Amino acid sequence: SDGWNASTLHLYSHSGTHMDAPLHFGVSQETIDQYPLSAFMGRAWVARIPGDCTSKWLQVKDLGAIENKLERGDSLLLQTGWSHHVNDSSYRDALPRISDELAEWCVERGVKILGVEPPSVANVNDLEELSRIHRILLMGGIVIVEGLCNLENLKGESVFFMALPLKVQGGDGAPVRAIA
């Protein structure tokens, strides 16, 4: 009736497509607002992982030809089709997850951003695994983006990728708008 609309938003910092900051797992005190914008964009390789990925440990061998193409500073997007499970309990409870081997490989190769379709890079029901995988990646300086969707629509094996988080002061993470 006044000619305008406005809404109040209440968001969990790790809802939907989101990014984790090192503070999230106590790796350091670095928060989401302290990252430079350059950390959120660049060339990304799309690894298409076929088949049923339910509860699968994702390994370096699953990357296929991408394994030898990725250069230091490139990003890696893992297309598993898992975003299609978003309305099932399996989305959270039976997700494909990053193995220690793949996490360590990403650090050694200097991956800039690791993007996945599930809501986490590790089993959310196993705190030890969840903490271990996040810590390997975050201590290695890798930006983690979780909850991606529509990766199957990306053409080609590499894209220019951006995942821009809300600049939440002191945030342990934030929702992002991801585009490629």
Please place each PLM-identified region on the residue numbering:
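Active-/binding-site microenvironments in catalytic and ligand-binding cores
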Residues: S1-A180
